[in-house]
């Protein structure tokens, strides 16, 4: 039998056949890759892609790590709840009792520090499980968002931790409990319940705003457990209304993680799961959406200067590709980002992935000194001292 000649036509035909098979295989692999479910919480609003990452701006701050010395030589745990005292000098912090929960601890989680880091007051032992957000009202009262209840392991170790958490607590300047919003130890919907409240803000007129819920940032689509909202209460705790829901559009949230108000009375919401700030009237009408401050965990606005401090503890290639963790400082009136402080070096990855560590809560004293509460992998407090700001 004669063998066929290896003509150019035969070779070309074989090449086309092989190329066709390879193309089909690559197409199938690509389709399979697209079919893989997105990492929980990784999907972002479409408008997010239009914002170029801002990672390279001047840093006018000197960083002081390990700020603050706790009583009895105890170590700091995770800290996200930080706010400046009514005097503009002292800073309040909610330490998660040396670890990441106070459910089995007997120490005071709420501590008041002077500018040198000395604790001058503390309270809250046995009352708070997971201090997550904090605000100080015009009378010096301390409001704490306690964002979870004790888990099964913690309850087995300390049964008295039952019936606590998922609430907003109002304390007097001396640490006396004055008011409880929500039903302790239970999750649900307002007006009687919260579901892992992130933060609380008291407006100048006394209206109470609560950002709820924490876990929504890890969900990619709506469902029975996908909740996100801002709830409003009268100064005496009477429920007014809730606004917002889970989603990616303007006026929707995926975990309203931190709240702030500017000198015009506009409500700023750090919508962390959607990597943006949303701005509202005090009645909940949506005004604007900003993506230039990254994936914000903590938000603070100086009421006199409208300087905006946005701290990002989570950005990495999984959850906010192209952006880096850090502190971004800008103007709440114009939206311009002016300064950037990069994350601390860390050989350990954060809970979200990626290396580096930056605070989750942020506040500023009357001299412009910035204080950050660190959740991990570095914990405790950090102080940023302005050196080069005109």
Regions found by a protein language model. Name each.
Residues 9-12, 20, 176:
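A periodicity- and composition-biased signal for non-globular, repetitive helical segments
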Residues 1-14:
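N-terminal secretory signal peptides that target proteins for export/translocation
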